[in-house]
């Protein structure tokens, strides 16, 4: 059967108007019905019989057809559908209805629709033009706004208010369309009709706005957006943040938003009565829309919605029912063998890091942390229904030009669902979600922000410290509970924001000061800092070897471009392996559980001591971070169980982040006045961290030159304190009644250092130095505790000098202090 030919004239309708028969569409309908009846699979069975049987169910009305099957069956039919899609679409739906009737009893008034999947060509949003109106297209983009589902009038039945005649099946052209004239020959009514809703046909209708993805965007261009119209079963198939493919056609619709302005101009000058004015607002204005002002715009009528890249998790990165078998079926044999080979690689951890960031030299710990963030932990739900996040949040703090933004850009390009934004240019609504008014329905709808767009992905936030405080508070909930709660303009909703956050921040003043703790170097609040699992600090230090290596790497990139990049695995290999590894749900073994508890206890003990000062307080959130990192390590090795070796690496990475000890030189120039003040307020001291910071920030007092040189590095101070503590603990274990005084410790230390002392001046200096160290261990770090024997004597015996009283004090090690490894 040949397709083509002009439309032939047909019969006349009741009103005497001539109807035209579309022969091309009729032939398409007949050929398409034959295709549905005759299309066979590899096993010889009909491909669409089972799908058509599903259409008998009341809630189903759409048949999905693979467009490649049509091309294989009849290329001319496929070409006609592609070029004349909007013209032949109603006839294709009738063919589906005829095919479904062969499967069983179907209500006479039930409408059916068709959806085409796997359409070969894909158009960019920027390439849509009026030349493509009515043809079958496939476009892709990221959903930024979804409207609620409404019923749409597709075919109306009207009642003439003059003669009570019924006008059936008036097709609605994307706006409220009344009959042009009453079908009664003796009635000349053209305006007064009422809609009979019981006999009219409605269909589910939803508007979705999509935007160009960052990869398709030309450099320096503003992203274009287009409205998608979804009907029937296609509604609610795309959520805000999804990257989807839409198959359908480009159409022209009246611009309803221009109606208000047009009506306002029209009604102010018109001398009409109240009734006519009401009709003008409700019916006549819509009827005249686009006729006077030519207010039309392009929209996309979609029949099918699919994931942009389902093989790499373009839409659903963490599908709960995803199994190893289903992922394997999506890969070729060679791809699956490569994934299996990677899982057996004994040096997988290192190779993944180098392959993921080949252009960044060094910073191995940050590469490992970002890699574990991409694998992620296991999300859990307690018996009470509380959700525990599995995503890992990472913050990179560093001096300028230390490749912070490069890490963020690499992750954005690699991850299938990542959003890159800047903290200073982002508001709270832009990061979470905004409530905006629809220009047509004047209803409030939710427009997704960066965290919603990155749902099931990674949100990269640069210049995180430049955000306003009120904007930082807005993401508290998203970082821990992974939801966004909105109560604005009558809209109350809780939205998902299951995203990992990779943030980059600059220190206060532009340079990281080692003499201050992390919280004083970064302009971030304590609640925000506690929600990050890993903190990495980058300091721009002058190192001849490192500077040479970095310069060589940069020059190689500029000279040879991609040739100088050495990758063990390609980006596609890592994406496939990441998708496969993320379906593992590792369980914590008994040995790993005990090891996690022991490591957390060590972190808490280390945080309580004054010497090993932490970046921030160790809380239960760090315990949860340790669990998430351990699960991520197990996922990376495709293990179903978390082993102690996974916990060990997670603890090492967490320790690099948490115990970032700021070690300025220790000065002993405080004088004896502080000693007296400390002694009086011994019970009201602050914690060790604050005491350490107070000591660091104090200016050097003007003292005699005898005390001016009493300084030592923090490493030397720590070494001496460890020697003293080890000696005291050894003496307490060997002797039942051990009474070590300050004098005993001084004499023991000088005896140990006898080989290094040559002159009397050095002896006096060493003696004064060890006395100052012991004084600091007692009053500042609280590692040693003094017990005063003079309390047992009478008041007359206590009239001694301060030196005698000090020498008489018994010293013991604080029982809560634990030596570092």
From Swiss-Prot:
It is an enzyme of class 3 (hydrolase). ATP binds at residues 398-405. A zinc finger (C4-type) spans 160-187. Residues 679-689 have a biased composition (Low complexity). It is found in: Nucleus; Chromosome. Residues 697-707 have a biased composition (Polar residues). Its EC number is 3.6.4.12. Residues 665-707 are annotated as: Disordered. Acts as a component of the mcm2-7 complex (mcm complex) which is the putative replicative helicase essential for 'once per cell cycle' DNA replication initiation and elongation in eukaryotic cells. The active ATPase sites in the mcm2-7 ring are formed through the interaction surfaces of two neighboring subunits such that a critical structure of a conserved arginine finger motif is provided in trans relative to the ATP-binding site of the Walker A box of the adjacent subunit. The six ATPase active sites, however, are likely to contribute differentially to the complex helicase activity. This is Maternal DNA replication licensing factor mcm6. The gene is mmcm6.
């Amino acid at each position: 059967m040949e397709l083509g030919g002009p439309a032939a004239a047909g019969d006349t309708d009741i009103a005497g108007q001539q109807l035209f028969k579309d022969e091309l569409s009729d032939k398409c309908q007949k050929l398409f019905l034959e295709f549905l009846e005759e299309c066979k699979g590899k096993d010889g069975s009909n491909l669409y019989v089972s799908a058509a049987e599903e259409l008998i169910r009341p809630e189903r009305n759409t048949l999905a057809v693979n467009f490649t099957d049509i091309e294989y069956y009849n290329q001319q039919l496929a070409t006609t559908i592609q070029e004349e899609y909007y013209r032949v679409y109603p006839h294709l739906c009738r063919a589906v209805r005829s095919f479904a009737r062969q499967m069983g009893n179907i209500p006479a008034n039930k409408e059916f629709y068709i959806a085409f999947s796997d359409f070969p060509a894909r158009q960019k949003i920027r390439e849509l033009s009026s030349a493509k109106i009515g043809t079958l297209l496939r476009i892709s983009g990221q959903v930024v706004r979804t409207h609620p589902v409404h019923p749409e009038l597709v075919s109306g039945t009207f009642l003439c208010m003059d003669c009570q005649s019924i006008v059936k099946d008036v097709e609605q052209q994307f706006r409220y369309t009344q009959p042009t004239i009453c079908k009664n020959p003796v009635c000349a009514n053209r305006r007064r009709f009422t809609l009979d809703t019981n006999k009219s046909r409605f269909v589910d209708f939803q508007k979705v706005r999509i935007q160009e993805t960052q990869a398709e965007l030309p450099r320096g261009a503003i992203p274009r957006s287009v409205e998608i119209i979804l009907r029937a079963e296609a509604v609610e198939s795309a959520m805000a943040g999804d990257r989807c493919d839409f198959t359908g056609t480009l159409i022209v619709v009246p611009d309803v938003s221009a109606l208000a302005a047009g009506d306002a101009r029209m009604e102010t000058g018109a001398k009409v009565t109240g009734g006519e004015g009401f009709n003008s607002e409700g019916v006549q204005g819509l009827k005249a829309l686009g006729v006077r002002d030519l207010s039309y715009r392009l929209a996309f009528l979609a029949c099918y919605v699919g994931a942009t890249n389902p093989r790499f998790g373009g839409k659903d990165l963490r599908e709960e029912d995803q199994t190893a078998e289903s992922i394997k079926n999506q890969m070729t044999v060679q791809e699956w063998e490569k994934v299996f080979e990677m899982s057996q690689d004994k040096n997988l951890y290192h190779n993944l890091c180098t392959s993921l960031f080949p252009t960044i030299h060094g910073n191995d710990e940050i590469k490992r942390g970002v890699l574990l963030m991409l694998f992620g932990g296991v999300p859990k739900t307690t018996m009470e229904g509380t959700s525990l996040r599995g995503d890992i949040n990472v913050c990179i703090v560093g001096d300028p030009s230390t490749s912070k933004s490069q890490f963020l850009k690499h992750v954005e390009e690699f991850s299938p669902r990542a959003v890159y934004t800047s903290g200073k240019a982002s508001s709270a609504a832009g990061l979470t979600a905004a409530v905006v008014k629809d220009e047509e329905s004047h209803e409030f709808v939710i427009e997704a922000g960066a965290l919603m767009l990155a749902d099931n992905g990674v949100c990269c936030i640069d210049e995180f410290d430049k955000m306003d405080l009120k904007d930082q508070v807005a993401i508290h909930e998203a970082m821990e509970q992974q939801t966004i709660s909105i109560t604005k303009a009558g809209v109350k909703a809780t939205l998902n924001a299951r995203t990992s956050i990779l943030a980059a921040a600059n220190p206060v003043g532009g340079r990281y000061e080692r003499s201050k703790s992390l919280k004083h170097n970064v302009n971030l609040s304590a609640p925000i800092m506690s929600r990050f699992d890993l903190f990495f600090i980058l300091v721009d230090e002058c190192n001849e070897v490192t500077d040479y290596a970095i310069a060589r790497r940069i020059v190689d990139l500029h000279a040879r471009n991609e040739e100088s990049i050495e990758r063990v695995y390609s980006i596609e290999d890592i994406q496939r392996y990441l998708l496969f590894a993320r379906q593992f749900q590792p369980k914590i073994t008994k040995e790993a559980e005990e090891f996690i508890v022991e490591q957390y206890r060590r972190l808490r003990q280390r945080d309580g001591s004054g010497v090993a000062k932490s970046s921030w307080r160790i809380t239960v959130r760090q315990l949860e971070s340790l669990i998430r990192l351990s699960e991520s390590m197990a996922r990376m090795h495709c293990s179903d169980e978390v082993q102690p070796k996974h916990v060990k690496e997670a603890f090492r990475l967490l320790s690099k982040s948490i115990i970032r000890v700021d070690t300025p030189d220790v000065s002993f120039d405080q004088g004896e006045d502080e000693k007296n003040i400390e002694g009086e307020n011994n019970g009201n001291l602050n914690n060790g961290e604050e005491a350490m910071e107070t000591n660091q920030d104090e200016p050097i007092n003007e003292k005699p030159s005898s005390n001016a040189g009493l300084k030592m590095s923090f490493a030397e101070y720590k070494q001496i304190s460890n020697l003293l503590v080890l000696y005291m603990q050894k003496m307490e274990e060997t002797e039942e009644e051990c009474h070590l005084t300050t004098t005993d410790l001084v004499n023991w230390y000088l005896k140990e250092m006898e080989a290094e002392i040559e002159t009397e001046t050095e002896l006096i200096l060493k003696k004064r130095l060890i006395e100052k160290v012991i004084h600091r261990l007692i009053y500042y770090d609280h590692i040693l505790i003094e017990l005063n024997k003079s309390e047992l004597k009478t008041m007359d015996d206590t009239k001694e000098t301060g030196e005698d009283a000090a020498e008489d004090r018994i010293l013991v090690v604080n029982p809560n202090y634990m030596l570092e490894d």
